[in-house]
């Protein structure tokens, strides 16, 4: 089976039929004001011919790498017709009669060609420029940029030859040449006159390092009755403009530059498995007198700076005198005093060692006991009579003194060295002999036993308990938290209320006449005055320190309880008419008092 037929062409209108325009109306068209517009015809659903889909699917194919497209291959059928006169199947087409009418052969009228050179177009030039001015500019440019190098047939596109520009600027129209020609022809574009492109051109990138280019340039000859190899001739009237190329375009013949890496896998493997060792050249040794020259240069700079500072405010005569003066002592003369002896004496340190040792002794020994170590005499300054004092003797004496004082194996108690016969122990960040580490009160040996540090003095447990304060209530030693109150010392659990036995730690309390401790509620309940009316104690209100009471008829009353017994009016001596008028120890107001008197008098 051949390829599917192409899709049908658009339908043709019958001869003489004209579609009405939107801008004018036909005579048969109804008026808009009188009659409504006719309903538009029902649109038919567009259909797609199956043969057209098959034809479109058959043209779809995948192009391989470096494969030319269909348009680049000559005489290649587009897939529509296998033979020149193959008829398309009509099928059920709507315009079958019209297609058959168009398919009929018709006679064609030949148009005679015009005479030769009758209508020859001129090459387009720059309409806004004078060709003569361009020619003069090119001539002056050639004079400045003259070169003796031979003209190359291969020139890049963007590099124009001045001779070519001048040639085409002054070129007059001439008939096309027939036959062989050895001169280079340049294509002049009919759309642009500002640039001319050389006929034979190549890419500006040349890979001459990887392959040898042996291609030669061949000028293609053309004739008026035949086409060139690329079929790239275009006719404008009777003039034929030929697009000449160095060789026919064939994508399969394109030379590609070879990669300098022949095998990438081998290069990667070699780089990853080979250790490249580079020989490091040792720098040449410095000259032997380099250090001496650097020292001399540094000394010269220092001396120059010192002399510059010295001579800054002097006159010329003073500067000359300074340059010519010599030192009072020559370099060979000896110093009048012994410098080494001064250095040795400065490192003896007898005075400092004596002060450090004395300070340690005073800190470690009690104040009432004298230190048991030997006091080293202070070193006196050497005078003229002791100038010949032996340096060896001073050094040995100083070293022995320093060893005794700075030795860490010295007992703090007795000041003697700890040896194997007299072992020591470490306590309170100090070192003691075992026999010297005793209790400060009972002289009990404390080595290997528990002790208490009281004012930097070791104390045994018995002496420590005896030194503690005793509770006033239970007469026992207080080893933990204690309370001091009322001139005594108490345990927390021993300082309690005398009535309710509640601990008074952090609670207000008071004393009675027998110095018994009571809490405030128990004290008021036990010793506060009672109200004569309600028989309750009169205590201070919340937040108050003192209680308020009313005393009448040698009795105490609450403020709220001091009122008339008959009418219940609050009695107060500050308000007129509200005073208390008692009868037989009864609280009565003035009115109730008169009423009771009238009743008694009536009876």
Curated annotation (Swiss-Prot):
Q: Where is this region: Disordered?
A: 1-131, 166-193, 218-237, 310-333, 363-395
- Polar residues: compositionally biased ranges: 184-193, 315-333, 363-373, 382-391
This chain's protein is named Zyxin
Give me the stretches of Pro residues compositional bias. Answer: 1-13
Stated family:
Belongs to the zyxin/ajuba family.
Presence of keyword NADP: no
Q: Which GO terms describe its molecular function?
A: DEAD/H-box RNA helicase binding; metal ion binding
Where in the body, by tissue, does this protein show up? Answer: Expressed in neurons and body wall muscle. Expressed in pharyngeal, enteric and uterine muscles and in spermatheca.
What sequence ranges are listed for the domain LIM zinc-binding? 409-470, 471-529, 530-601
Look up the record and give one Gene Ontology term from the biological process aspect: nervous system development
Zinc found in the keyword field: yes
Q: How does it assemble?
A: Interacts with dyc-1. Interacts with glh-1 and glh-3.
This entry carries the following GO cellular component terms, namely: actin cytoskeleton; axon; focal adhesion; M band; nucleus; stress fiber; striated muscle dense body
């Amino acid at each position: 089976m051949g390829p599917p037929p192409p899709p049908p062409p658009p339908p043709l209108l019958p001869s003489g039929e004209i579609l009405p325009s939107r801008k004018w109306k036909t005579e048969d068209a109804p008026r808009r004001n009188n009659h409504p517009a006719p309903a538009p015809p029902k649109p038919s659903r567009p259909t797609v011919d199956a043969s057209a889909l098959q034809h479109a699917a058959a043209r779809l194919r995948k192009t391989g790498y470096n494969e030319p497209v269909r348009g680049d291959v000559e005489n290649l059928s587009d897939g529509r017709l296998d033979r020149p006169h193959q008829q398309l199947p009509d099928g059920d087409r709507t315009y079958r009669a019209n297609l058959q009418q168009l398919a009929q052969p018709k006679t064609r009228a030949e148009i005679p060609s015009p005479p030769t050179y009758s209508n020859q177009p001129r090459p387009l030039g720059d309409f806004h420029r004078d060709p003569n001015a361009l020619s003069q500019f090119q001539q002056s440019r050639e004079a400045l940029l003259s070169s003796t190098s031979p003209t190359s047939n291969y020139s890049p596109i963007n590099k124009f030859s001045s001779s070519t520009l001048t040639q085409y600027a002054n070129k007059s129209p001439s008939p096309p040449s027939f036959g062989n020609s050895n001169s280079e022809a340049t294509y002049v574009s009919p759309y642009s006159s500002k640039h001319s492109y050389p006929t034979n051109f190549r890419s500006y990138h040349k890979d001459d390092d990887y392959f040898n280019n042996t291609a030669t340039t061949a000028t293609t000859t053309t004739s008026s009755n035949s086409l060139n190899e690329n079929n790239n001739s275009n006719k404008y009237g009777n003039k034929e403009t030929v697009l000449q190329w160095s060789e026919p375009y064939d994508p399969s013949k394109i030379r590609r530059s070879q990669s300098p890496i022949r095998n990438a896998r081998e290069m990667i493997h070699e780089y990853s498995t080979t250790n490249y060792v580079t020989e490091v050249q040792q720098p040449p040794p410095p000259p032997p007198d380099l250090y001496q020259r650097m020292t001399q240069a540094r000394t010269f700079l220092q001396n120059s700076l010192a002399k510059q500072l010295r001579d800054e405010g002097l006159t010329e005569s003073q500067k000359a005198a300074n340059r010519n003066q010599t030192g009072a002592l020559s370099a060979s003369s000896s110093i009048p005093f012994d410098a080494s002896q001064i250095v040795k004496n400065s490192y003896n340190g007898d005075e400092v060692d004596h002060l450090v040792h004395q300070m340690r002794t005073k800190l470690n020994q009690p104040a009432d006991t004298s230190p048991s170590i030997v006091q080293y005499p202070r070193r006196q300054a050497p005078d003229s009579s002791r100038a010949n004092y032996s340096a060896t003797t001073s050094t040995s004496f100083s070293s022995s003194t320093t060893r005794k004082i700075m030795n860490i194996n010295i007992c703090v108690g007795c000041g003697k060295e700890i040896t194997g016969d007299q072992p020591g122990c470490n306590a309170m960040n100090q070192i003691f002999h075992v026999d010297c580490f005793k209790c400060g009160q009972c002289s009990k040996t404390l080595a290997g036993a528990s002790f208490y540090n009281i004012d930097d003095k070791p104390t045994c447990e018995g002496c420590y308990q005896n030194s503690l304060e005793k509770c006033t209530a239970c007469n026992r030693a207080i080893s933990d938290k204690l309370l001091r109150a009322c001139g005594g010392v108490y345990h927390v659990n021993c300082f309690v209320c005398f009535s309710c036995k509640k601990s008074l730690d952090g609670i207000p309390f008071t004393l009675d006449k027998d110095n018994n401790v009571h809490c405030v509620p128990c004290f008021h309940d036990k010793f506060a005055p009672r109200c004569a009316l309600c028989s309750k104690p009169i205590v201070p209100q919340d937040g108050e320190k003192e209680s308020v009471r009313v005393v009448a008829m040698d009795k105490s009353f609450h403020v709220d309880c001091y009122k008339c017994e008959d009418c219940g009016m609050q009695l107060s001596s500050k308000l007129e008419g509200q005073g208390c008028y008692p009868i037989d120890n009864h609280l009565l107001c003035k009115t109730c008092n008169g009423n009771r008197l009238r009743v008694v008098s009536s009876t």
